[in-house]
Amino acid sequence: KILETERPNILISIERCSASFDNKYRNMRNDDISPFTAKIDYLFSIHDKTIGIGDGGNEIGMGNIKTHIEETKILVDYPAISKVTNLIASSVSNWGAYGLLAALSIKINQNLLPLVKYQKEVIEKTVQLGAVDGFSGLKENKVDGKDLKENSHILNQLHELVNNQLKSSN
């Protein structure tokens, strides 16, 4: 019903958990988080333009590469089954999202990437409010085990890439 009402052109999922073969939703540590997870993966199965961004194998869209996830020992034991039109698999989902924003920035000739300072503040504030790092499960200023310096470095590199592309196209 929500798709009929809102009529989105595309659905994009970043680091959103999806059901595995047994219809349970698990985090990277294979904990069952079904009671705390919005079951939005269903929407992706009925829309014709979808993008999934994930890093651990348990996210919406990772069903596209389920067999490969099952073959590796460093990803989840219960991979997601949901599929998407386009999958962005990255070592950190945030970085995959930044990559998508960088590509869109170049396409429309405008830098859409968030400012590094803003991203640091968002991470720090969410941790203050109780968020935990997805890798360690601890309340620390990290994203999937990567500290703020490493996150900032990736984002700075993408800003440099986008800005150089925008300069050369003008």
Predicted regions span which residues?
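C-terminal functional extensions of proteins
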Residues: 61-170
